[in-house]
């Protein structure tokens, strides 16, 4: 007897919407890539499949999308003046920011570099810079 084939569809959201409310928690741990975009932005639509593809390939990384129209204050806090803008964090430390639609190879290269970082050194330098900025 042949049974009808059932198809199971797993709805896995590969990217996360980042808002002012979930931003700090979202960038706190691990590697995080943020894509600042807007619906009216042509280059943003060209970059979207690259970003989505990387998110599906690297499930251990948080891929967040920031709608600059809905989250104007958040975009302003990053100084975003051109979109798309890609921002990278590791363990809560901002490490990279670049405007423009990057090709897939550049995104993969960035991910490789983020994975290879010695975070002990990075944390020490980050704390030193933070203390200097606060006048300590």
What do these predicted regions represent?
Residues 119-136:
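CheY-like receiver
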Residues 31-33, 46-66, 72:
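Conserved helix-turn-beta segment immediately C-terminal to the redox Cys motif
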Residues 41-44:
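Short cysteine clusters
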Residues 32, 72, 78-87:
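Structural micro-motif
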Residues 28-39:
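Short active-site neighborhood of thiol/selenol oxidoreductases, capturing the structured segment around
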Residues 87-121:
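Non-catalytic, surface beta->alpha helical segment in thiol-disulfide oxidoreductase systems
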Residues 6-25, 60-62:
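N-terminal "domain-start" segment that seeds a small globular fold
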């Amino acid at each position: 007897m042949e049974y009808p084939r059932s198809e199971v569809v797993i709805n896995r959201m590969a990217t996360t919407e980042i808002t002012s409310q979930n931003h700090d928690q979202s960038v706190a741990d691990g590697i995080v890539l943020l894509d600042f975009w807007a619906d009216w932005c042509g280059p943003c639509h060209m970059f979207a499949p690259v970003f989505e593809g990387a998110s599906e390939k690297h499930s251990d990384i948080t891929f967040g999308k920031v709608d600059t129209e809905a989250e104007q204050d958040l975009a302003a806090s990053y100084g975003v003046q051109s979109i798309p803008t890609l921002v990278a964090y590791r363990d809560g430390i901002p490490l990279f920011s670049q405007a423009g639609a990057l090709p897939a190879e550049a995104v993969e290269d960035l991910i490789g570099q983020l994975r290879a970082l010695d975070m002990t050194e990075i944390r020490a330098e980050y704390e030193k810079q933070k203390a200097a900025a606060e006048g300590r």
